[in-house]
Amino acid sequence: ALFKIAQIYKDYQESEQTFEKLEETYVVNPDGSSVTEDDWNDDTRIQFDALKKENPDIMAWLRFDNFDDVHISYPVLYSGDDSKYLRSDIYGNYHIAGCIFLEGLNNPDFSDYHSIIYGHNMRNTTMFGDLKRYKNDEGFYEKNQFFNVYTADKVYRYQIFSYYDVDEDS
């Protein structure tokens, strides 16, 4: 049992390190310098041409405004197959956390009236794990209402209006 727990922890750490490295490498200020956690704004640019060399399915980058509270800053992938990134990393290797991905029936350019983004609710609060705080912390919403989706063409700004727990079997 201890080995299994250690393996899960190691997997979580490897996943986070992969995404942090992608952010350090491909998320930049207009002058080309690396973006720090506090630098993110509408002028922040994702180097999608270079990032797509890592995986051509990367369509966007999702990031919450208040990164001190909500540690969500990930690429959003799209393949048209909702199971592809459920349990695999951006390189196609098995990984329990999978990736953040766009619903297969959506257009990958976020032009639909509703775009559905999936991600796991990890116990260590990675991926979409911090979102459960909307349910359990009354003041959390007031401080964490907004997030941005950065695409190659524009930045979409969204306000959260609801939270819903979905059973894993649904």
Model-derived features: where do they sit?
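Solvent-exposed, non-transmembrane regions of membrane-associated and secreted proteins
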Residues: 1-170
